[in-house]
């Protein structure tokens, strides 16, 4: 509601488009006083006492997102306000607008306003679980817990049960009193272990404000049963397009919770294939909107014959129905609020074997550095010490292991293709979580039709990325796009062909993969997204990388930089190096303490 005070001392109130609980409260105040409705102005003319009471009431209304540590942008406040008032809604916001803090704020505000009680659930892609946990910790003091399936959580106990059962099976072949006694003891042990497994599984649900589960985890019967038992009142699905097929297991698992009090979904591209995507999504968010699939198909789907979907119909009607439960935000809504470059960090977890291997590499590096220090102590001139043959060998071994640690974080295929025999000693046989996180991110970006530049310091990574993208293209048409490349082996003419003729000027190329050879001298004004597959070697290179899309000739008012980080990997050390150099730049160059 907008309040107006005219020069002649008269007071007016004007309604806004959002009819919320708060707005209803303000209308109730107006009804307490004598008023006139001005048909020309479409406003209420109210007495001064009414004006002051409404003014006081507006000031008492909590600002959307007030439960967070960090403020929201105005367009994010709109999202939070809409969702809190609706109770269930679809957030259709393009990449980079910050849907994550919105979903966190909705839960935190709902708890604060006593709209709900107890723990909430956020369902995400597997590659984003760690990222979500970090975001909850960044924006709130809430405790977020990543849920595991019953099998994953109790694997060690289950192994003990299997071993004990094998002993029982062996004893059953014996016909003796001693065997029967032993079987009884082992059976009791199994019962105890089963109780321990149940306790361990349920323990992850204790003392948590927000549960974070990927869609596959929600397919676990035990997880769903425990969530039902706890009667959660808040559930949000990030990348809700993952349930676009109502017959898929993940969709059925999500829709099992369509009775949760507050339900939300977020996506940059909620409808990816055809209007049936909307049917499946609303089956969770608001099942009464389209109660029967057959009626939905008849009303909104256009078929070409043989059951093949040719398109849609009655689109305006469908949009009007969805709009009651949907808030849409584009980059244009955010351009006046966001800085010119929006940096976003996404985290993933390495396989436990890779974490242990990284720890081994770091221990080896530490031992080598200690050995080097002992040698250098013998020299009064450090530069002379660096010429020592053993020191040169040690330095080479340190650099090699640092490289192997970084390659381990990126993809073990780098180690496998290495010419170094030593590199093969650090292969664990585990898949790259970071590579899958990249594919998930590309899926979001390519669906928008925007261009994206990917930086990796390794030229060999270009082949690995290309192979994975082409594999994804076999079942996802959004990945059927041309890929341009820049690396140190190209001439100036070839670089121009790749960066301009292909990537900048052709609609057939959405992806440009570059080594740090492309970090300077190339303008990528058409790219809206830049992904750093691993941290740069230095703050300077990082600045150069990001400068490719932060340019005066950019066709975008806002560009987005994603940095992919594997937790407990060499990435974290590389970030510390960059942060240290950034402090130097701030203090020495910019004069900022």
Features from the language model and the residues they span:
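SF2 helicase motor core recognition
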Residues: 219-222, 273-275, 462-464, 496, ...
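Inter-lobe coupling linker of SF2 helicases/translocases
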Residues: 212-218, 224-231, 249-260, 291-418, ...
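Conserved pre-motif I regulatory segment
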Residues: 60-92
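Conserved Helicase C-terminal RecA-like lobe
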Residues: 94, 102, 107-112, 121, ...
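A conserved SF2-helicase RecA2
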Residues: 537-543, 550-593
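Conserved P-loop NTPase motor "coupling/switch" region that bridges the ATPase
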Residues: 119, 138, 150-174, 180, ...
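Conserved Walker A/P-loop ATP-binding site and its immediately adjacent core
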Residues: 102, 117-139, 273-277, 457-460
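Accessory DNA-engaging acidic/polar modules
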Residues: 1-69
């Amino acid at each position: 509601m907008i309040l107006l005070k005219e020069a002649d001392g008269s007071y007016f109130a004007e309604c806004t488009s959002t009819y919320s609980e708060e707005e209803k409260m303000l209308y109730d105040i107006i009804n307490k006083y004598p008023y006139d409705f001005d048909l020309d102005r479409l406003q209420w003319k109210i007495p001064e006492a009414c004006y002051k009471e409404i003014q006081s009431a507006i000031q008492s209304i909590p600002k959307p997102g007030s439960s967070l540590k960090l403020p929201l942008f105005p367009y994010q406040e709109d999202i939070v306000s809409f969702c809190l008032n609706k109770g269930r809604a679809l957030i259709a916001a393009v990449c980079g607008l910050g849907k994550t803090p919105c979903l966190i704020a909705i839960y935190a505000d709902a708890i604060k306003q006593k709209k709900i009680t107890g723990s909430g659930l956020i369902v995400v892609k597997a590659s984003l679980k760690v990222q979500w946990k970090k975001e909850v910790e960044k924006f709130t003091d809430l405790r977020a817990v990543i849920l595991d399936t019953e099998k994953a959580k109790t694997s060690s106990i289950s192994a003990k049960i299997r071993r004990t059962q094998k002993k029982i099976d062996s004893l059953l072949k014996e016909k003796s009193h001693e065997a029967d006694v032993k079987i009884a003891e082992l059976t009791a042990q199994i019962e105890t272990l089963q109780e321990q497994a149940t306790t361990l599984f349920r323990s992850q649900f204790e003392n948590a404000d927000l549960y974070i589960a990927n869609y596959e985890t929600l397919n676990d019967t035990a997880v769903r049963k425990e969530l039902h038992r706890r009667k959660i009142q808040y559930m949000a699905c990030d990348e809700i397009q993952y349930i676009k097929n109502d017959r898929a297991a993940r969709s059925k698992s999500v829709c099992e919770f369509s009775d949760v009090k507050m339900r939300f979904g977020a996506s940059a591209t909620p409808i990816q294939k055809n209007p049936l995507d909307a049917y499946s999504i609303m089956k969770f968010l608001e099942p009464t909107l389209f109660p029967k699939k057959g009626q939905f198909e008849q009303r909104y789907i256009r078929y070409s014959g043989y059951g093949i979907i040719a398109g849609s119909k009655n689109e305006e009607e469908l949009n009007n129905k969805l709009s009651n439960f949907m808030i849409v935000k584009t980059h244009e809504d955010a351009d006046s609020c966001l800085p010119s470059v929006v940096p976003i960090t996404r985290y993933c977890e390495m396989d436990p074997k890779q974490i242990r291997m990284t720890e081994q590499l770091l221990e080896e590096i530490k031992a080598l550095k200690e050995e080097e220090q002992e040698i250098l102590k013998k020299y009064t001139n450090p530069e002379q010490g660096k010429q020592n043959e053993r020191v040169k060998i040690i330095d080479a071994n340190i650099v090699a292991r640092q490289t192997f640690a970084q390659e381990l974080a990126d993809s073990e295929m780098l180690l496998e293709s290495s010419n170094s025999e030593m590199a093969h000693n650090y292969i664990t046989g585990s898949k790259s979580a970071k590579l899958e996180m990249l594919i998930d991110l590309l899926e979001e970006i390519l669906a928008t039709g925007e261009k994206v530049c990917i930086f990796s310091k390794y030229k060999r990574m270009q082949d690995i990325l290309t192979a994975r993208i082409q594999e994804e293209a076999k079942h996802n048409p959004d990945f059927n796009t041309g890929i341009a490349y820049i690396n140190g082996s190209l001439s100036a003419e070839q670089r121009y062909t790749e960066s301009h003729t292909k990537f900048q000027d052709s609609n057939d190329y959405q992806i440009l993969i570059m080594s740090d050879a492309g970090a300077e001298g190339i303008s990528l004004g058409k790219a809206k997204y830049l992904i750093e597959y691993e941290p740069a070697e230095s703050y300077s290179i990082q600045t150069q990388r990001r400068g490719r899309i932060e340019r005066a000739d950019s066709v975008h008012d806002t560009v987005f930089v994603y940095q992919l980080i594997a937790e407990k990997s060499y990435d974290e050390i590389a970030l510390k190096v960059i942060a240290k150099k950034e402090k130097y730049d701030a203090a020495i160059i910019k004069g900022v303490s």
